[in-house]
Amino acid sequence: MDRTRKQCSVLAFTDDAVLPVSTIVNAVRELGNEGAEQCDPQVVTQASSLSKLPVDSSSMDIVISICRSLQFQGDFLFEEISRVLKPGGTVLIYKTLQSVAEGTSEAVLALERKLLLAGFLEAQGLQLNSLELSGLDHSFGMKAKKPSWKIGSSFALKKSTKGSVKVNLDDDLIDEDSLLTEEDMKKPPIAPGGDCEVGSTRKACKNCTCGRAEAEEKVKLGPTMEQLNNPQSACGSCGLGDAFRCSTCPYKGLPPFKLGEKVSLSGNFLAADI
């Protein structure tokens, strides 16, 4: 593991014509890399005239950018930094106050936002008070990491297996008889025949259920023997025939007759004509 740290690949670029190696070593040491003095960094100067870094893709563990002048923004190189860094690699960016037009806090927020938009993770500011970087007085810095995955990489997602819940349908059924009480189980008493009101004259009640009302209705349909032997009429129209009789007339259906005379029926009155 220590050997890997000693052999870490470092790329540093700046807009100056000269960049001391000691500045790069001190910057790498701040990352906690042991044996930073033994690293062999690649240095690119006057990078403001470049549109592409002259290194292979995914070949660097650390990339350091040092910006001193306002003319060299270096923002167009963020994509190049992401290209040359290995997955999980680190980028360090240092800017002097002369290289920014706004204040320090605004410049730090703008730089952090640009790093996040370029795809870097864990962007955070650096405390330069403890750094001994030559020529970087009155400056601010920030570091970030490239994601550990490669662009275009894919992996299979594990589908969560849903366990089937066993449901016993019999447990959901309720015996209806268990909901009934002893009073509910008793059969209702059956009303005896002729249960209408008992009085001086037995007659069907209003809500008759014993059949007395039907029997009384049948009696009312035809004239009694007393009415046949001694016909009488309260309206005076019973003997004129059905055309003059009311709907409840007991003589309805009988031939016309004279009141006070005995009504006699022929022997074949109920016999069929055919």
UniProtKB/Swiss-Prot annotation:
GO molecular function terms listed in the Swiss-Prot or TrEMBL record: 2 iron, 2 sulfur cluster binding; 4 iron, 4 sulfur cluster binding; electron transfer activity; metal ion binding
Region N-terminal SAM-like domain, residue ranges: 1-154
Keyword terms: 2Fe-2S, 4Fe-4S, Cytoplasm, Iron, Iron-sulfur, Metal-binding, Mitochondrion
Residues involved in [2Fe-2S] cluster binding: C196, C205, C208, C210
Annotated motif Cx2C motif 1, positions: 235-238
Cofactor: [2Fe-2S] cluster; [4Fe-4S] cluster
Annotated stretches, region: Linker: 154-185
Name the UniProt record assigns to this protein: Anamorsin homolog
Source species: Ricinus communis (Castor bean)
Native organism taxonomy: Eukaryota, Viridiplantae, Streptophyta, Embryophyta, Tracheophyta
